[in-house]
């Protein structure tokens, strides 16, 4: 079991905080966001960790010595969405977590006993243009829709078993060959082909994970953490 952390982006909506710092290295309680993820993974014995870097990539170098992670450079980080980041490490997808680096994890939700492809999901209200999971009592994902409502969303943490990963890689290769991937997120490979995939939902408590997508999100997280202490 391994983990792929997507950390190549510009973090434009977090400016000015990301003018000189990658979003994944923005500090929360005096620790970079990505270090919470790495340490939680290692707590569960998941030590093979690949970080896709791009913007200000040299700032991630210290993580190699501190945690023994692997860094992969996405030289197209300013041109494409995260589809290309996953394309670069597609052969690593089997039996791997895929994690968005802009998530603050309140607790360790990682499991080292997963055997099936899983989207970890929190319930959110008043969402705008969010990706929602549609599933039944068996927790198998039937559809992924983009909507503005309340419900369980893609939360930036997923796990992919080998058979599902093999299919996703074929979808990635097809999209790459077509050249029509500039605006794609890697999750489009799942969303657009969900009827061919066996993917399940792991429901998380609402206070498990928090996406930092803007300065307002960051300030809100600061308030949440202050009230917890």
Swiss-Prot record:
- Which cofactors does the annotated protein need, by name? Mg(2+)
Coiled-coil positions are none
Control of this protein's activity is summarized as: Mg(2+) in slight excess of CTP gives maximal activity. Strongly inhibited by Ca(2+) and several other metal ions, such as Cd(2+), Co(2+), Cu(2+), Mn(2+), Ni(2+), Zn(2+) and Fe(2+). Also inhibited by Mg(2+) at high concentrations. CDP-Cho is a competitive inhibitor with respect to CTP, whereas diphosphate is a mixed-type inhibitor with respect to CTP.
Q: What pH dependence is recorded for this entry?
A: Maximally active in neutral and alkaline conditions.
**Transmembrane among the record's keywords?**
no
Task: Name the GO terms of the biological process aspect.
Answer: cell wall organization; lipoteichoic acid biosynthetic process
Disulfide bridge map: none
Return the EC number. Answer: 2.7.7.15
Residue ranges spanning the membrane: these are none
- Which positions in this protein are listed as binding Mg(2+)? 102, 211, 213
Question: What protein does this entry describe?
Answer: Choline-phosphate cytidylyltransferase
Q: Which organism is it from?
A: Streptococcus pneumoniae (strain ATCC BAA-255 / R6)
